[in-house]
């Protein structure tokens, strides 16, 4: 019955998908929230069942901000939230350094796991995009929304010649502008006498929480860059306040696009 419902849903005029952190786990081996805690807090991460040993810096910060591991557990989102709240009422160079170091770790862990990754590990991503990006001409493009920072979907699309419209310009430097979501790609005949037909394999990608390759300048411009710094990377780091951060640009625009997509009939 579930399969029948899903198949009928795919026949609708508008198809919208929402991808969370689970799509980057499994075979591709992206970092989980626990992995981020392990690498931000412990001096001996990835040591299997051995007892974890927090770094001296982490122990000092946890003690200073009053974070209770027994109550809130080993939760990097809760820890960084407590750090942010603490810094709102008291200046602490030690806590600031820990937050900066943690952001650098998160940025690296969400980027590095794809370096040299075997193409077969993205097989599920490739199959998903291949099937949903090739739709009937009369149907709208598939819209994929994700809260992930990583580039799994970008890599999977690139490996099979799919085109993603992600709100960035098509020239260098690639800058973010929401109007690019309104663009489409068509195949024009060589004579130019006929109206073009929509190109197959095109979909929209909306990264609600930003991306590891988005860099925001002091003027507010957002560009695609290979290695942005933790301070300039345009993404919402794990924290309970991420919902409030979603109401600043460009995240507000992306959330608005998501809500608008949900209101479309036949979706």
What does each of the following model-derived ranges do?
Residues 7, 197, 247:
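Residue-level marker of regulatory loop/turn positions in helix-turn-helix DNA-binding domains and
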Residues 1, 122-129, 181-192, 243-260:
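A Trp-anchored, charged/polar loop motif used as the substrate-binding/catalytic surface
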Residues 26-27, 217, 244:
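A generic structural signal for short coil/turn motifs at secondary-structure boundaries
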Residues 56-89, 135-240, 250:
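Extended, H/D-rich, highly charged conserved domains that either
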Residues 111-116, 179-180, 241-244:
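Short, basic, glycine/proline-bearing loop/turn elements
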Residues 1-155, 162-164:
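Gly/serine-rich nucleotide phosphate-binding loop at the start of the catalytic core
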Residues 16-22, 148, 207-209, 231-267:
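Glycine-rich anion-binding loop/nest that anchors nucleotide
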